[in-house]
């Protein structure tokens, strides 16, 4: 048999793929809903890329009540870096949308700022940003009590602010260390790299 050539699609997955067979049971409405969610996720990725480019180029956006504009402008105003990978191990790491660590304006006290842009509809929680804070502390040998911490989530037309206490970050750091060790032990027993 001479197979048709589809080399341009290698490594990709069709929306209606055989390996994601659940669509066989979708109603038309469910199909449309799932596809729109996929489009929204793609748009979210594109918006994150756009925001990151604006921040890196120090290109402010027009003032508005949109989270994207506020996120970009605040990141530039606070001299933040965009898309910074925070690493504890190959098992635990993550990328912060916007991050800054340095002296606070008008103070000798250090501050860690982590901002996150959420483009979806599901209300966001601070847990992800608290994990980034723990990863920062672990990677750079910092103690949460040695600095001020400000976390922000930009979503829709809202900005959520949170200043976690060291007692909230320390257990996350401990969990990362413990779970990382457990996974490494399991990988050793299972002969997995």
How would you label these PLM feature ranges?
Residues 33-113, 120-127, 139-149, 159-164, ...:
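Catalytic cores of nuclease domains that cleave nucleic-acid phosphodiester backbones
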């Amino acid at each position: 048999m001479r197979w048709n050539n589809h080399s341009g699609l290698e490594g990709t997955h069709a929306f209606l793929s055989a390996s994601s067979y659940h669509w066989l049971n979708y109603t038309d409405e469910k199909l449309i809903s799932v596809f729109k969610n996929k489009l929204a996720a793609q748009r979210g990725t594109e918006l994150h890329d756009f925001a990151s480019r604006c921040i890196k180029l120090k290109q402010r956006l027009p003032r508005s009540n949109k989270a994207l504009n506020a996120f970009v402008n605040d990141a530039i105003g606070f001299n933040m870096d965009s898309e910074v990978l925070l690493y504890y191990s190959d098992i635990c790491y993550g990328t912060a949308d916007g991050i800054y660590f340095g002296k606070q304006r008008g103070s000798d006290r250090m501050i860690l700022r982590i901002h996150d842009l959420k483009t979806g509809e599901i209300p966001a929680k601070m847990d992800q940003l608290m994990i980034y804070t723990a990863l920062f502390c672990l990677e750079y040998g910092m103690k949460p009590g040695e600095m001020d911490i400000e976390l922000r989530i930009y979503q829709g037309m809202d900005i959520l602010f949170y200043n976690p206490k060291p007692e909230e970050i320390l257990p996350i750091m401990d969990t990362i260390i413990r779970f990382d060790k457990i996974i490494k032990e399991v990988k050793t027993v299972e002969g997995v790299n």
